[in-house]
A protein has these predicted regions:
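Bacterial N-terminal signal peptides
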Residues: 1-10
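Noncatalytic, solvent-exposed loop/strand surfaces
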Residues: 15-415
């Protein structure tokens, strides 16, 4: 079996950066560090700053800068904004990019996609379909609007797919009930490098995908792995051409099977949550041509995540369900190693978890934050803290600190 490794989006990434939504290797795994474990909503909170509007994006970190997107103001009067802070919580700059398209979901916003950086430029995407590049002083280098260029985007809910970097391009995924596509723009100029149509016939709402592509490397080739519309597809990152595809996720063509959680990829295996959190499947992320459910390595019913993206590490997959159930399954077989239902709360677990060593950080929409120790035999809750806030973004663990973006505030927690 050819082994795939998640491609670092920037050559020479420094260990203590968090350049995109799911971290240094885009897999939800933090670099080794002495991260906070025991704390409260007040103790060890080094600082917190009030957000100027709604946003569900995860902060990114590059050197001494913390950057995130947010609405500036509310509803139709608000604007798409990019905010930059230092490690003392001081706002260094704020750049507005035009009128926002407000969120529809109670926890949604016009600023759900996270920033991605190559260390020189910041790339952003909003529900308004504005895509832009900025420098680290907040200057807009280029800006475009995908709806103006390619037609209306008809998501039922709120745009959730974050941009990713592949080679010299930044890639955006637009998967909805209209004409769907992948778009690669040159990082420097913003000009179109390629555009690849991605359309499938689906029942109501099923064509809509809020997942983020993954960039993986295999045999000297960089592949974009894309999940949505009942298909997992692999595309040549240089051209957008489809290399392989998997169908078979929805053989009875059920409606409303939109996809939110992104796949996890480890050791050449893609782990895909589907069926509104009721199914999980593993398949090889290599090859060519069209494959079906018969080509899955495994498929499990009753295990899955609707919104939170799983983590695959060291032959194990950690899955956080909608109500807080945590599963650990074998990467190669899908067999359940353990299941835990101790994480409780009044809200849904929309936030994707973060793994640091053997510590799993999990939070929910009603402000519950759990730090758990995971092992081959199970999970142990080390800390449960309740914040007066709402969490849908991913906990960021970097430089021995945790950044936590809530609806109300951005928190920095450390020892």
């Amino acid at each position: 079996m050819t082994v795939l490794a998640l491609v670092l989006t920037t050559m020479g990434l420094q260990a203590q950066n968090w350049p995109e939504w799911r971290g240094p290797a885009a897999n939800g795994i933090a670099e080794q560090g002495n991260y906070p474990v025991v704390f409260s909503a007040t103790d060890d909170v080094l600082w917190k700053v009030k957000m100027p509007g709604k946003g569900g994006s995860t902060p990114i970190v590059w050197k001494d800068r913390i950057v995130l997107t947010s609405g500036v103001g509310e509803d139709t009067d608000g604007e798409d904004g990019v905010l930059c802070y230092n490690w003392e919580g001081k706002l260094l700059w704020q750049t507005k990019l035009g009128n926002q398209l407000p969120g529809k979901h109670r926890r949604g916003s016009g600023s759900n996609p996270s920033v991605v950086t190559n260390g020189e430029r910041l790339f952003v995407f909003f529900k308004s379909s504005t895509a832009a590049a900025l420098d680290f002083e907040g200057k807009i280098l280029w800006k475009t609007n995908l709806m103006e260029e390619y037609g209306e985007i008809s998501y039922f809910w709120d745009l959730g797919s974050s941009p990713v970097l592949a080679g010299n391009n930044v890639v955006f995924a637009v998967m909805h009930e209209g004409a769907s596509y992948l778009l690669a723009l040159d990082q420097v100029t913003g000009k179109v490098a390629w555009k690849a149509d991605r359309n499938y016939e689906c029942k109501a709402e099923t064509a809509q995908s809020y997942s983020t592509p993954l960039v993986v490397g295999e045999g000297g080739r960089t592949t974009l792995v894309v999940w949505g519309a009942d298909h997992l597809t692999g595309h040549n990152a240089e051209t957008g051409k489809m290399i392989w595809s998997y169908s078979g996720f929805n053989p009875t063509q059920r409606p409303y099977w939109r996809t939110i959680a992104s796949p996890a990829v480890s050791e050449g295996i893609a782990v895909v949550p589907f069926g509104r959190g009721m199914h999980l499947a593993g398949m090889k992320c290599i090859g060519s041509g069209n494959m079906t459910g018969e080509d899955f390595l495994w498929e499990k019913k009753g295990i899955g995540a609707d919104v939170a993206t799983p983590i695959a590490s060291n032959g194990k997959v950690y899955v956080v369900g909608h109500t807080g159930t945590v599963w650990c399954v074998d990467l190669y077989t899908g067999n359940e190693l353990w299941k835990n239902e101790e994480l409780v709360g009044n809200g849904a677990f929309f936030s994707s978890p973060t793994l640091a060593g053997n510590k799993l950080y999990v939070c929910n929409e009603e402000g519950d934050l759990y730090v758990c120790e995971v092992s081959t035999s199970g999970i142990k809750i080390l800390n449960h803290t309740k914040f007066d806030d709402n969490f849908v973004s991913t906990p960021v663990l970097v430089r021995d600190r945790m950044l936590l973006r809530g609806t109300k505030n951005l928190y920095c927690i450390g020892n």
